[in-house]
């Protein structure tokens, strides 16, 4: 059994990968992404990783707060891919596939992806992903910080009322320490395995296969408008192809979606 520590995680990783990683684990941070972005701006190298047992100010997409239960897995990974802004969605898709595989390896549960950045198990959201980047004068990324937060087991007393309908955990109970170490190591192995050939976008077909929204009735939510339609496909640019109720078909690249019950 491996302890939940930086060395414990490295001990599980393949040796060639472990030698390229620099992991620091904290009991608590306000946000692993915020902490790692500061290191990135100061010149930290690719492969720098920050992990926390708990976040006091976790962040999600669109500036939302992210619920961070004590003893979850909150991990941020620094990469330096030198790509344009339009390539960032593929980093998110790659991360989602890597985490879905890691979950299946560690808890043997079917993991599905809700476009564009959430992982669901047994119909409940167990993981959120947030990728953040900075760009140079040539519009190429100076760094990308990949953040993922995973609910390992259900919190004592259940999830807060405002998210209890959608939030879930990998296990109702169990050894968090062992599972967190195994999950972190599996995620890093899958992530860097795909990152080695990210330009091929070989993960995109699997991203499509794992989609939990394709073929479903959905609502596309923006600050000024909510529209209803059906998710038809995910295109080669990782946009969601939606046939709206009015008859138009659009390739959606931004916004929030919810799956509707017909």
Show where each model-derived region lies.
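N-terminal lobe of the biotin/lipoate ligase/transferase fold
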Residues: 1-105, 127, 135
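Long, positively charged amphipathic alpha-helical accessory segments at protein N-termini or as interdomain linkers
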Residues: 2-10, 85, 93-111, 121-262
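Short loop/edge segments at beta-strand edges and connector loops
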Residues: 27, 113-115
